[in-house]
Curated annotation (Swiss-Prot):
Protein species of origin: Rattus norvegicus (Rat)
Lineage: Eukaryota, Metazoa, Chordata, Craniata, Vertebrata
Cellular component terms per the entry's GO annotation: extracellular space
Family statement: Belongs to the serpin family.
Keywords: Glycoprotein, Protease inhibitor, Secreted, Serine protease inhibitor, Signal
Signal peptide limits: 1-24
Subcellular localization, as worded in the UniProt entry: Secreted
The protein, known as: Serpin A11
Amino acid sequence: MGPVWLWLLIAELLLPVHYQPSSAHGDKSLGAPQPASHQSLEPAPAYHKVTPTITNFALRLYKQLAEEIPGNILFSPVSLSSTVALLSLGAHADTQAQILQSLGFNLTETPAADIHRGFQSLLHTLDLPSPKLELKLGHSLFLDRQLKPQQRFLDSAKELYGALAFSANFTEAAATGQQINDLVRKQTYGQVVGCLPEFDRDTLMVLLNYIFFKAKWKHPFDRYQTRKQESFFVDQRLQLRIPMMRQKEMHRFLYDQEASCTVLQIEYSGTALLLLVLPDPGKMQQVEAALQPETLRRWGQRFLPSLLDLHLPRFSVSATYNLEEILPLVGLSSLFDVEADLSGIMGQLNKTVSRVSHKAVVDMNEKGTEAAAASGLLSQPPSLNMTSAPHAHFNRPFLLLLWEVTTQSLLFLGKVVNPAAG
């Protein structure tokens, strides 16, 4: 018999951005974690104990991926970190501490129980219904039908992470794989398909996480302004001709001389915003090295609103990773260590994680704007000189950070090197 496998499977989806009439609500948070305010006597929500750590972990993981992968990068920090934290519920003694510390938590300052309650609060808040933002997260456990999982683990996983458990027959690998892929396809409305790679007949458990995001721009792009063929410079040798959305609109942005990049904040309706980082030509590595929580906070304090001539690619990008080789490089080696104690999941049958599969999809466009052709949402003040507006032309590789504002949580982090790669 071959090795017994435990799998973590994470699937993410950021769906097309549609038209939404502009609302009258005020400016949102700037999209980077800000110091907590102590003016209110009400206790801070429990998710405040985990969201800064999720961001720190995401930046560490991104830098490691950037060293290994020359092309597009996309992953969901909330999805991946919550899945790893859920798994730690089944770890005992040193293994649990090592997993949580590897995510970046200081267990002296934030005990394990507070961490799990923080994730519970975060997932619950993100899952609250919103008329302007569709955000759906979920965890599912597929356990071999011959196993007798620990009831305490199943109860805690359901209570804290909303994880549902299903019995599976892994000896029928093809049928079970189809069952899991069908669930992902259903929960992501058919947008993420075939996310589960082939697994061994000796697999015992698949831990699945998915996140589905769909939102509308606060200031939509007019599809009639989109140029079907505009240059995008992947590098000094490769130039593409791609659809480029165009807009002159009020946005918050800045130029960071120290990092050599332009940073733009684009708001969605509802409680989400997108941070786009455009390095100067040849400065991508310099910008990536500067990606620190302090940098995000500094940007958040320096944004200024201005009329902007914006050119942004219309693109769809997907990324699939097997992270079992990457996660140990950011400290999560204990998940894969043969000495790891995960007996809290299945009692005496203690096995390590063999595979962490992660798939993310982002699709950004101006779809739906034709429904608002008469709404006049290019609402620049008439006194502004449109010809003198500063410009941000995303015609070369750039970074994207998608935030949920209420929780200050980083939903997606990525790099678009080739917007035509699909």
